[in-house]
């Protein structure tokens, strides 16, 4: 079956096996890869998503989703947990992030990769 994946889609995925602190098991993931790659590559770049609890700490590499996008629990996209997986690991479509969420994901991703510093994220834009 041919499935068309889009940047910003959320799917359930089987991330097992994981080693050490890698996210593993069946969990939601956010597709980060560009749509050209999504169309032609057998692999796909994702970020793991986890549910949050009252004890969860806030990290600058986390983006909180609350209960948007078809997720049943308040959740966090962990942009320090990026990996390339085979498309066969993707199971069920859950939802899609809106433009505003994806713009914030992009900023958080740039921070996680060290391309944009945390200081720049908190400074107002100057024209």
Regions found by a protein language model. Name each.
Residues 119-127:
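Conserved small/polar residues in nucleotide/adenosyl-binding loops
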């Amino acid at each position: 079956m041919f499935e068309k994946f889009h940047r910003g889609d959320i799917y359930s995925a089987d991330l097992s096996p994981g080693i050490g602190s890698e996210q593993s098991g069946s969990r939601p993931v956010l597709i980060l890869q560009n749509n050209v790659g999504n169309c032609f590559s057998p692999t796909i770049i994702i970020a793991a998503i986890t549910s949050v609890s009252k004890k969860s700490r806030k990290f600058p590499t986390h983006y909180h989703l609350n209960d948007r996008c078809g997720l049943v629990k308040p959740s966090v996209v962990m942009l320090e947990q990026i990996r390339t997986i085979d498309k066969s690991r993707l199971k069920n479509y859950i939802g899609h992030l809106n433009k505003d969420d994806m713009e914030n994901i992009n900023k958080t991703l740039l921070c996680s990769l060290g391309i944009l510093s945390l200081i720049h994220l908190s400074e107002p834009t100057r024209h």
